[in-house]
């Protein structure tokens, strides 16, 4: 299956932001497939191999919220990376799966303004590929200090369609949110 990354706009297009007083047809915060990600898909398809998405990284954008472009090959300023913790199927669209990381309370002391989904190289001696790149509403991730602590969950939608095989590698040491644990325990319904 081919994976395409897109922005999901809560509430549909009526909620699109105004930029400079003019309504836009794109959301302010979004994620897109990079050229390197598309090239990796094509090479994987030709080689009969899957694209393996395994890591999500976040960055502070070097103090600014970047505008994602498909020519990105790295984050502007990466501050944290983590193996993908979990994935879930979209409740409304079976062609969309969500990849998630949870940044735990023990990590922090940085701003999040950008993120990237990294794919493993096709060859053992290759370099990981920035598969998808997006921006993030500015969020300060606290580190557990003096009784204050936060976790932060980042979820990225991946749209599956039909030309390349995409695998999402979930860390064996994945992190479950409190809600997920309650759902597993049967205390909270879906």
Regions found by a protein language model. Give the residues of each.
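N-terminal assembly/attachment segments of tailed bacteriophage virion structural proteins
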Residues: 2-172, 189
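A signal for long, low-complexity, Ser/Thr/Asn-enriched, surface-exposed stalk/shaft
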Residues: 176-190
């Amino acid at each position: 299956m081919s994976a395409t990354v897109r922005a999901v706009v809560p509430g549909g297009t009526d909620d699109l932001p105004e930029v400079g007083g003019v309504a836009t047809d794109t959301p302010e915060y979004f994620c897109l497939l990079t050229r390197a990600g598309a090239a990796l898909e094509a090479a994987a398809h030709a080689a009969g191999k899957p694209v393996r998405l395994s890591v999500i990284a976040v960055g502070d954008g070097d103090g600014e919220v970047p505008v994602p472009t498909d020519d990105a090959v790295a984050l502007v300023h990466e501050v944290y990376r983590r193996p993908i913790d979990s994935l879930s199927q979209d409740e409304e669209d079976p062609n969309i799966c969500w990849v998630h990381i949870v940044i735990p309370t023990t990590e922090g002391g940085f701003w999040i303004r950008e993120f990237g989904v990294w794919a493993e190289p096709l060859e053992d001696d290759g370099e990981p590929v920035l598969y998808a790149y997006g921006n993030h509403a500015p969020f300060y991730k606290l580190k557990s200090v003096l009784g204050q602590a936060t976790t932060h969950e980042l979820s990225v939608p991946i749209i599956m369609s039909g030309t390349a095989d995409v695998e999402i590698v979930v860390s064996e040491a994945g992190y479950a949110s409190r809600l997920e644990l309650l759902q597993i325990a049967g205390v909270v319904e879906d």
